[in-house]
């Protein structure tokens, strides 16, 4: 059975009150149009960003192919001055390059010290902060990070989930975003937080037969659009044009639920991590049994988890 292809709903002129009281509790992706983002959507041209962003050194992903794979790491990390990154990312062919003349670039901005500081565009790029308004769709104390993203045209980012809620602000350019529900995790062939299925448009169903069952939610983002991505929703992003985006991440759960060492917003909540460690110990204990018994008691455990932990709410 082929999975459903569903459009992500779009709404225009949503107020803070509408979002927080009626839309946010639904925990579903949503494209918001007509949000006041400040002058960034018209000001952030290649020339302007190069001039204002200056020579600040940034760490980037460089890939010889458009389809980036975090599992096999088919890219390298390099450092460039910000102005050079912007100019190179806007090009199709490069006179100067690291890997090949048609290599792709991807910036995911970091904190000053990524081991202890979260990304915040207002701190790392202070001359740009006056150009952009963050939608006030969460309480200030819930704020986690704001991440600057710059992508070459055609670049595809692997399917993954984040543990924070986020707003993806498409400042310039155009992106296609495909999302999958957390309820469809069993069809996505996960390795950690990421899916092994790279080619989501033409997947190898002999290798990944269950992928066809995953429901696919899709939207196109243009300059000024804002996509709400709830925590745990998987997303795959293609930059159809050179573009600049900003992600704003915030905490859906109380702060004490999150790993305090997490500066990226992608470590599972501490209770989930503890449960996974307990499960690993249980599996080692099960391994002491012969296969026939191990299989039987593993199935009983799965049924017990489904009964006690799966949500009874239908989507």
Swiss-Prot record:
Any Pfam family: Cupin_8
The name this protein goes by in its record: tRNA wybutosine-synthesizing protein 5
List of residues binding Fe cation: 160, 162, 235
Catalytic activity: 7-[(3S)-3-amino-3-carboxypropyl]wyosine(37) in tRNA(Phe) + 2-oxoglutarate + O2 = 7-(2-hydroxy-3-amino-3-carboxypropyl)wyosine(37) in tRNA(Phe) + succinate + CO2
Outcome of substituting residue 108 to A: Abolishes enzyme activity and ability to bind tRNA
Binding site for 2-oxoglutarate: 106, 166, 175
PANTHER family linked to this entry: HYPOXIA-INDUCIBLE FACTOR 1 ALPHA INHIBITOR-RELATED, TRNA WYBUTOSINE-SYNTHESIZING PROTEIN 5
Function: tRNA hydroxylase that acts as a component of the wybutosine biosynthesis pathway. Wybutosine is a hyper modified guanosine with a tricyclic base found at the 3'-position adjacent to the anticodon of eukaryotic phenylalanine tRNA. Catalyzes the hydroxylation of 7-(a-amino-a-carboxypropyl)wyosine (yW-72) into undermodified hydroxywybutosine (OHyW*). OHyW* being further transformed into hydroxywybutosine (OHyW) by LCMT2/TYW4. OHyW is a derivative of wybutosine found in higher eukaryotes.
